Curated annotation (Swiss-Prot):
Primary location class: cytoplasm
Native source species: Rickettsia conorii (strain ATCC VR-613 / Malish 7)
The protein, known as: Ribosome maturation factor RimP
Compartments where found: Cytoplasm
Signal sequence bounds: none
GO biological process terms, semicolon-separated: ribosomal small subunit assembly; translation
Family annotation (Pfam families): DUF150_C, RimP_N
Family to which this protein belongs: Belongs to the RimP family.
Gene3D superfamilies: Ribosome maturation factor RimP, C-terminal domain (2.30.30.180), RimP-like superfamily, N-terminal (3.30.300.70)
Keywords: Cytoplasm, Ribosome biogenesis
Biological function: Required for maturation of 30S ribosomal subunits.
GO cellular component: cytosol
């Protein structure tokens, strides 16, 4: 049985892709009224603008009105996934090779549940990180959550754009 977040993702993802956006995350915040927060990113690595979020929000709102997946009243928030975006799909790790990432695990691996390092490669459901001077192999299924890290190197690249 799919969660409501997965059902929402299933009905909006194709439309967002057609618009040039990647659906990063769907999550609920608050109680009454609920807030449906949807994070998007650009498929072509451009920055997400306020206009992009507005355009995506209108499309998502129309789809959710037709699909009627959410029973109670809710507010819709569409935002950029940001510079420290979450990595929620295995494919994300290949897209962000050589980027710094923070990973929190569901259980201990080598006595730790948190790792930070550069993504070396991602293949066969495994993430290879360079943490300080050692390489760490993490099974993707062990990852509870992961986010990119805003490093000085990334910040300098952004300033040049």
């Amino acid at each position: 049985m799919q969660t409501i977040e997965q059902q929402i993702a299933n009905v909006i993802e194709e439309s967002l892709t057609d618009m040039g956006f990647e659906l990063v995350l769907v999550k609920f915040k608050g109680v009454n009224p609920k807030v449906v927060e949807i994070l998007i990113d650009s498929l072509n690595s451009e920055k997400i603008s306020v206009e992009d979020c507005t355009k995506a929000s209108r499309t998502i709102s129309a789809i959710l009105d037709v699909e009627d997946l959410i029973e109670a009243a809710y507010s819709l928030e569409v935002a950029s996934s940001g510079l420290e975006r979450p990595l929620v799909k295995f494919e994300n790790y290949n897209r962000f090779l050589e980027r710094e990432v923070k990973i929190k695990l569901k259980e201990l691996l080598n006595g730790k549940t948190r790792y930070q390092g550069k993504i070396i490669k991602a293949e066969n459901n495994k993430i290879y990180l360079k943490c300080e001077e050692q390489e760490v192999l993490i099974d993707y299924d062990l990852i509870k959550n992961a986010n990119l890290v805003l490093t000085e190197e990334v910040f300098k690249k952004l300033l040049k754009q």
